[in-house]
């Protein structure tokens, strides 16, 4: 999955627009996310392992907010021939086009239906696994309960939702510490202070992270009885909920 180096915010911008998953971002996304999200590679790898354990024959897998298809590829490699279909959805046409190229580079018996659309409009049915990999944080907070409810209803008994997100923390000291560690991570990966500052400004109005408690409360309120935080590095985490 090739990608150019992310230099989107390397030059000073007079007016910083809100972050969007356009052609410019799609072209550098693989580099951007791996230099910005600690543990991203581990999360992607483990999605495949979870799929191997939980995806059942003749079911659907949903990758909601699929971007370049990293999660879909990891899942497809691990589930083998189970007569399943993966439905990979993103609202960015640029992401979908590049995802199609990435998927085409690997031969598999598992078909992938690529959908350019709003995940809030997608029907979830006969699902054994649903993935929201750093997606929900970009949804309007008022839309999140309804999405989780739809996912829960569309999952088969024993099916899983894997939810990866940046987290907020109620304890301001913990928030400050983990923010600082994350900034150090980005600096160590070659981002300048200008890039970090401008990227933060672009995300300010479009990314609204929840706390871990908010995620757990939402999932259990919609019916999930089993919930676990299986991965965390700094203020980035991945959770699994089982129906």
From Swiss-Prot:
Disulfide bonds: none annotated. The keyword Protease does not apply. Its EC number is 2.1.3.-. CDD domains: AdoMet_MTases (cd02440). Keywords: S-adenosyl-L-methionine, Transferase. InterPro entries: CmoA (IPR005271), Methyltransf_25 (IPR041698), SAM-dependent_MTases_sf (IPR029063). It catalyses: prephenate + S-adenosyl-L-methionine = carboxy-S-adenosyl-L-methionine + 3-phenylpyruvate + H2O. GO terms for molecular function: carboxyl- or carbamoyltransferase activity; S-adenosyl-L-methionine binding. S-adenosyl-L-methionine binds at residues 40, 65-67, 90-91, 118-119, 133, 200. GO terms for biological process: tRNA wobble uridine modification. Catalyzes the conversion of S-adenosyl-L-methionine (SAM) to carboxy-S-adenosyl-L-methionine (Cx-SAM). Belongs to the class I-like SAM-binding methyltransferase superfamily. Cx-SAM synthase family. Homodimer. HAMAP family: Cx_SAM_synthase. This is Carboxy-S-adenosyl-L-methionine synthase. It comes from Shewanella woodyi (strain ATCC 51908 / MS32). The lineage of its organism: Bacteria, Pseudomonadati, Pseudomonadota, Gammaproteobacteria, Alteromonadales.
């Amino acid at each position: 999955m090739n990608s150019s180096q992310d230099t989107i915010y390397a030059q000073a911008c007079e007016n910083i627009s809100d972050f969007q998953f356009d052609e410019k971002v799609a072209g550098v996304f693989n580099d951007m996310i791996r230099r910005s999200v600690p543990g991203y590679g581990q999360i992607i790898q483990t999605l495949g392992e979870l799929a191997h354990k939980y995806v059942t024959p003749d079911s659907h897998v949903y990758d909601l907010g699929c971007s370049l298809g990293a999660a879909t590829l990891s899942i497809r490699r691990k589930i083998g021939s189970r007569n399943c279909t993966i439905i990979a959805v993103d609202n960015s046409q640029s992401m979908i086009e590049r995802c199609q190229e990435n998927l085409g580079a690997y031969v598999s018996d598992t078909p992938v239906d690529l959908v350019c659309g709003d995940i809030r409009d997608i029907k979830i049915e006969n699902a054994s696994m649903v993935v929201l990999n750093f997606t929900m944080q970009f949804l309007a907070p008022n839309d999140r309960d309804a999405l989780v409810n739809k996912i829960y209803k569309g999952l088969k008994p024993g099916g899983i939702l894997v939810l990866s997100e940046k987290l907020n923390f109620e304890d301001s000291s913990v928030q400050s510490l983990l923010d600082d560690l994350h900034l150090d991570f980005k600096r160590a990966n070659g981002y300048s202070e200008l890039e970090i500052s401008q990227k933060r400004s672009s995300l300010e109005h479009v990314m609204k992270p929840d706390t871990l408690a908010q995620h757990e409360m939402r999932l259990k309120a919609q019916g999930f009885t089993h919930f676990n935080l299986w991965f965390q590095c700094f203020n980035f985490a991945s959770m699994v909920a089982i129906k």
